[in-house]
């Protein structure tokens, strides 16, 4: 996309970090799933600053040092005589230079340095600790393998634990930004077009860019593009997760496929997989951040009445339609794959619509908590409850694709059931009920 969208909060935070680094060394970590827009954010941020952008290629240490040495000389005037062959010596020279000169240094795909030289992070820790007191460097690192970046900086056994002075986790674009982008490319878009865009991208910058730049700005064109022979949407789910999970992805993928089909309780998943999947579910949640447990609002955190949810809209789509129909892709039956998607589209996008409105409400209102609710028997279920504990307000929503299917009187009955169970939690709160449909997007 030619235009740079949103990221106002992140850019504001980065500008404050820049001011801080004029007086003391700053070490900022940018995380976020692949394709989220980390590199674009940083390139936009440094374009008018004295800066150097270093990309970690999977080459030998000596070759990488040669590439970086040239970039440092060209971009910030750090001229080092002789040929450098070790990352530790190069970083030492960078830290020494930063004692006299202020600059921004961005290292992309930072986690790959561990593969190139397993001892480098320990060496970097020592050099940082020894030189940061006199340095004025604004060091920013980012990486696309989320689980590795998290381990490098958040595992107390790792050498760089506690060294970051700031962390920014990049999240998908909000519903309002998705609307802005689609409106720029297709001013006459329908809400069905917007829902399809959200189903396929979930606000992830790269996926939106692929669709918009290919002219896929309507539901029909998006589905056509996604199921085309050259479509990156057919392979990206596998590519993104294998980089995180490595060779042990088989069971994880089977679990994600089941969750995408609506089997969201562990006992349901266990019965199909034929083994206890508890450890796998914990890893998918805590290590890979691909799923999360959803519990009824006001239930205890240890409540077993939990449902697992894929947190990423594209991955939910990928496992429901692409991974589960991989044979159609391998046989080149793209038209048949398209027919399968269109056949189940309305049912599948019901949950997408709920997620869209959850994010939209959270974006537009001041809330202390938001979520759904259901009783143990599953007989009473409320799509969205948005609470402001400070103002003692509680807004309850029923979500349907079609407005004429919303039944507020039935929703009121569910609210009464909800109130009788949570009791004191919302005693004295002003409660309102609403219905939202495609028309309200």
Segments (PLM) and residue ranges:
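Phosphate-binding site recognition
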Residues: 1-339
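A cross-kingdom feature that marks ATP-driven nucleic-acid transaction machinery
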Residues: 304-441
């Amino acid at each position: 996309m030619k235009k740079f969208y949103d990221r106002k909060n992140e850019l504001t935070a980065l500008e404050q970090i820049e001011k801080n680094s004029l007086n003391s060394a700053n070490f900022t970590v940018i995380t976020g799933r692949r394709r989220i827009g980390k590199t674009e954010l940083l390139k936009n941020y440094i374009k008018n600053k004295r800066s150097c952008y270093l990309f970690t290629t999977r080459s030998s240490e000596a070759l990488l040092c040669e590439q970086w040495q040239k970039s440092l000389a060209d971009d910030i005037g750090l001229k080092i005589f002789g040929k450098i062959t070790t990352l530790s010596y190069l970083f030492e020279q960078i830290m020494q230079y930063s004692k006299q000169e202020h600059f921004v240094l961005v290292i992309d795909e930072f986690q790959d340095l561990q593969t190139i030289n397993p001892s480098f992070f320990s060496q970097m820790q020592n050099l940082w600790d020894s030189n940061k007191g006199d340095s004025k460097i604004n060091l920013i690192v980012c990486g696309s393998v989320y689980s590795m970046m998290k381990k490098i900086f958040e595992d107390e056994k790792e050498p760089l634990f506690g060294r970051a002075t700031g962390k920014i986790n990049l999240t998908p674009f909000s519903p309002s930004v998705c609307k802005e982008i689609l409106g720029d490319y297709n001013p006459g878009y329908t809400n069905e077009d917007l829902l399809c865009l959200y189903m396929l991208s979930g606000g992830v910058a790269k996926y939106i860019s692929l669709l918009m730049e290919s002219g896929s700005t309507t539901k029909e064109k998006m589905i056509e593009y996604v199921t085309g022979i050259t479509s990156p949407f057919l392979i990206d789910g596998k590519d993104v997760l294998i980089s995180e999970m490595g060779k042990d992805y088989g069971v994880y993928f089977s679990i994600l496929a089941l969750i995408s089909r609506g089997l969201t309780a562990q006992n349901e998943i266990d019965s199909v997989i034929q083994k206890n999947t508890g450890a796998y579910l914990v890893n998918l949640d805590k290590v890979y951040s691909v799923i999360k447990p959803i519990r009824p609002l006001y239930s205890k955190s240890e409540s077993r009445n939990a449902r697992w949810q894929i947190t990423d809209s594209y991955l939910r789509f990928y496992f429901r339609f692409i991974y589960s129909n991989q044979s159609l892709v391998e046989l080149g039956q793209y038209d048949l794959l398209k027919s399968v998607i269109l056949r189940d589209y309305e049912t599948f996008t019901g949950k997408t619509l709920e997620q869209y409105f959850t994010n939209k409400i959270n974006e537009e209102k001041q809330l202390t908590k938001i979520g759904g609710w259901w009783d143990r028997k599953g007989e009473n279920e409320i799509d969205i409850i948005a609470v402001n504990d400070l103002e003692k307000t509680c807004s309850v929503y029923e979500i349907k694709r079609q407005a004429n299917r919303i039944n507020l009187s039935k929703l009121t009955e569910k609210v009464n059931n909800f109130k009788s169970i949570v009791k004191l939690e919302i005693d004295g709160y002003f409660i309102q009920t609403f219905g939202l449909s495609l028309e309200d997007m």
